[in-house]
UniProtKB/Swiss-Prot annotation:
Gene Ontology CC, one term: cytosolic large ribosomal subunit
Protein's GO biological process: translation
Annotated organism of origin: Rickettsia bellii (strain OSU 85-389)
Name of this chain's protein: Large ribosomal subunit protein bL28
Gene Ontology MF, one: structural constituent of ribosome
Protein family according to the UniProt entry: Belongs to the bacterial ribosomal protein bL28 family.
Keywords: Ribonucleoprotein, Ribosomal protein
Length: 97
């Protein structure tokens, strides 16, 4: 399992621990990932995704999972999230006809 958010694309960053004496040792900054179940109002389906804690609040701020997915940039989404977005758009179009 990769340490990457499926909705925002936030991944592992690398840097240094710096002590008081300025010695530098390499370290990894890992994202705070959570496995979350999102429920789509449009498709009435549940989707389990590995997302960062910051992304969870972004989804809530956007007005829910469907609103976030419709606004989301495809470049940041994982292949699973792209398929979910496509399914949401298709279902929304079918319901509007």
């Amino acid at each position: 399992m990769s340490r990457k958010c499926e909705l925002t694309g936030v991944g592992v960053l690398y840097g240094n621990n710096v002590s008081h004496s300025q010695r530098k040792t390499r370290r990894r900054f890992e994202p705070n990932l959570r496995s979350v179940k999102f429920i789509s109002d449009i498709t009435t389906a549940e989707y389990r995704l590995s997302v960062s804690a910051r992304c969870i609040s972004s989804v809530e701020k956007a007005g829910g999972f469907d609103a976030y997915m419709l606004k989301a940039n495809n470049d940041a989404l994982s292949t699973t999230a792209k398929a979910i977005k496509k399914k949401i758009i298709q279902t929304k179009m079918a319901k509007s006809l």
